[in-house]
Regions:
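Alpha-helical transmembrane bundles and membrane-interface segments of multipass inner-membrane proteins
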Residues: 1-171
Length: 171
């Protein structure tokens, strides 16, 4: 059991496994709901592009068979299965590391990574690729890449773990 007294001034006790399960589940469900809405309700897979805020936010359908920025795309079925297994193993490693930490921040950041990674794993299982659809362009600079809620969650989780004051003392 951990306490959040140093963060919120209250001595509420909680189990790290429950915190990770709740936050990861929230991210996972949010990711899957947004993908379902965009792919199936808005039919982005058929329309390919929808302008949300002109010159800033677009929904551009991209099926990412690889990893970040499409690396290893167009690989074999074995590579897809390998990526699924590696993602699950990394999630398990992060989970078992995080539950040993005495920091709500490290639990939060770890949960963001786990929830996002599992969202992308489900895409690989269901669709054979990750459904990316968010595209942000700014100031006249064209951005060819699309991403999703899971990617955002993973990004902030990794950045949070790297820059968390609690992680500086960790190996």
């Amino acid at each position: 059991m951990m306490s959040i007294k140093k963060y919120f001034g209250t001595n509420v006790k909680f189990k790290p496994t429950i915190v990770i399960a709740l936050i990861s589940s929230f991210i996972f469900i949010l990711d899957q709901l947004t993908k379902f809405f965009v792919v199936h309700i808005l039919d982005l897979s058929g329309r390919l592009s929808i302008t949300v805020i002109s010159g800033f936010i677009n929904f551009n359908m991209a099926w990412n068979e690889g990893i970040n920025f499409g690396l290893f795309a167009n690989s074999s079925e074995i590579m897809r299965i390998f990526l699924i297994i590696i993602s699950i193993l990394i999630c398990m490693g992060i989970f078992f590391w995080a539950i040993k930490q005495n920091s709500i921040l490290l639990l939060l950041f770890s949960s963001l990574i786990i929830g996002g990674a599992l969202g992308n794993v489900v895409d690989r299982i269901i669709y054979g690729a990750v459904a990316d659809f968010l595209n942000i362009t700014c100031c006249g600079i064209y951005n060819p890449y699309s991403f999703n809620i899971a990617d955002i969650s993973i990004f902030f989780g990794v950045v949070g773990l790297i820059f968390s004051p609690n992680s500086k003392n960790q190996n």
